[in-house]
Structures are given as structure tokens and as C-alpha cells.
Amino acid sequence: MAEKYPLQAGDPCVTLTEEDIWDVERLCLEELRVLLVSHLKSHKHLDHLRAKKILSREDAEEVSSRATSRSRAGLLVDMCQDHPRGFQCLKESCKNEVGQEHLVDLLERAFEKHCGDKLTQKWWESGADGRNPRRPPGSEDNSGYTALLPTNPSGGGPSIGSGHSRPRGRDDSGGIGGGVYPFSHGGARVVGGGWGGWGESGGAGRGGSLLSGGHGGHPPHGGPGGGGRDYYGGGGSGYYESIPEPANFPNSGGGGRGGGVRYDAGGDGRLGGLPPDPQEVDDPSLSVQGRGGPAPDPPSPPLRTRRFFCC
């Protein structure tokens, strides 16, 4: 029977079929293949896998005939991938064998991770609750994308997870984007990133603003911005100069790391580029320079010299 994983109360129950679970298990074995080949003692698992009818007598003889332990373990992993119950039976065998118990935790964590990814994909593609199944959560139109976890009671984005919850803009409890830290009302980690908090309770913005970099949160009561709004990827502007300036953020200004726009104060900006687009700044007073002085320019590349050698 297929296992059911309800993502959130009130949402439709998204179900993984047996074929989905088999795909996840094969993906787990493939991802952990290098580690399993190095640590799996194949001779300890042949009897259990034969008893569970995962391997036939000929399969066990073929595994035993391999010259090295790594080749035997690799063939055993391949055979478990080809059987719908191979992953679970191999995990049971590792749990029962002395010296192989540490592999059980790795297999279970990989299974949970890829099950969550598969569930999120199916939940998004289902199109329920206004979600648009034709647009992934990194596209420009994310109006229907909501977070998997409950939203923060203070407003803004959810405390953990990713997604859009409130319209972008100067708001007392953050802007677009699900929080990536429990204390964050702002920053996002959807595909392509999102906007951090802007207002009195803005958290630390991380990631990109859909098409480009990110937008840092603004103090007071919010952490420094972890992403930089720039049009050339990566990025990290720090927090802007706060108005009014709180005691715990003295001389707080721009700065940060990454390509694109450089904010010249309060941090060590890198790779300064084009100035920010005026249409993207909701309040010009927030883009003022701080009082920490200009950031240093990136170092020049080393000079190349040509050396001549005589024979």
C-alpha cells in the first residue's frame, strides 16, 4: 500500500505511490553508492537478501565470484536497486549485522530527504489552493505559491521553509519570502530566492529576488541582510543604515559580499557594478550610505610573466 504524507493540516493529502517510493529508494542507493561500496560488507548480507528473495542463488554466486570487496559491494547495490524491496531489505540487513549499523542512519536520512523533495514536487504540481502547476516556485508569477509550514504569528513569511506570504513592499512584518531561520520574518529560499523583510520586524533576507540577487532586511528588530539585490547573481548587501539607528546596530550601512551592486558603507562590498534601479527601491531614504566609509576595491589580478628556459 502506498504511504501517505500529509504536508499540512487543511491541505490536500499528497500521496506517494509505490512506484514513487521505489524511485526514491533507487535514488538514495545511487546517491550513497560511493559510500556503500566502501563500507558495505557484501558477504554479511547475502543470506538475509536470499531469505527475503531479493537475490537468487545465481545472484549470490555472482556476487561472491567478484575479485575485490568493492566490486562485490557495487554489484550487490545494483541488484538491490533493481528490486522494489531491495532498499528496505538491505537496510534491515545492515541493522542486524554488527559493524554495519551506521549505514542504517545514512539510508534513512537520504530516504526522508528525497521523499520530502518528491512530496513537494507533487504538492506543487497538484495545483490545489490556487497554486499554478505550470510555473515552478522560482518564476516571476508566484502569487499562488504558499509555504508548506505554518506562517509566523508576527506576520510576514513563515518562520521556517520557503514561499511567498505577503506582498512585496515596506511592511511592518516583512515582505515576500518564507524565512530560513526561526527568527526571520523575511528572507526566502525558494528557487531563485526572494525578498527579505523591510519594516520594523524585518528579518535577515537571504537568497535572490526571483530574477537576481536578494534584498537584505532592515533594522531595527531585524537581522542583517544576507543577500544583495543585484542583477548579476550571487550577492550580499548587508543591512542598510537604519532610520532611526538602534543602539545595537551602530553605523549600520550597506556593504556585504557578492557581485552586482555595491553598497559602500558598513561592510566590505565586493565587485561593485551598476547602481540600483530606482524602480526597485521603495523608499530612497533606505538606500543612503552609512558612515563606515567606502568599501575597499577588489584586489587586482596578479601580473602574468613569461619565463624563458634555455636547453
UniProtKB/Swiss-Prot annotation:
Q: Which domain of life is it from?
A: Viruses
The UniProt entry's GO CC annotations, sorted and at most eight, read: CBM complex; host cell plasma membrane; membrane
Q: Which GO terms describe its molecular function?
A: kinase activator activity; NF-kappaB binding; protein kinase B binding; transcription coactivator activity
Chain intervals with Gly residues compositional bias: 252-272
Q: Which PROSITE patterns match?
A: CARD
UniProt-annotated location(s): Host cell membrane
The record's listing under Gene3D superfamilies reads: Death Domain, Fas
Tell me, in one coarse class, where this protein mainly resides.
Answer: host cell
Keywords recorded for this protein, A-Z:
Activation of host NF-kappa-B by virus, Host cell membrane, Host membrane, Host-virus interaction, Membrane
Q: What is the effect of changing C310A?
A: Loss of host plasma membrane localization
| Region feature Disordered, mapped onto this chain | 125-181, 203-230, 243-311
Q: Could you tell me which PANTHER family the record lists for this protein?
A: B-CELL LYMPHOMA/LEUKEMIA 10, B-CELL LYMPHOMA_LEUKEMIA 10
Q: What does this protein do?
A: Activates host NF-kappa-B and JNK pathways. Induces hyperphosphorylation and redistribution of host bcl-10 from the cytoplasm to the plasma membrane. The inhibitory effect of cellular bcl-10 on NF-kappa-B pathway is then overcome allowing NF-kappa-B activation.
Protein name per UniProt: CARD domain-containing protein E10
**What organism does the record attribute this protein to?**
Equine herpesvirus 2 (strain 86/87)
Its lineage reads: Viruses, Duplodnaviria, Heunggongvirae, Peploviricota, Herviviricetes
Q: What is the gene called? A: E10
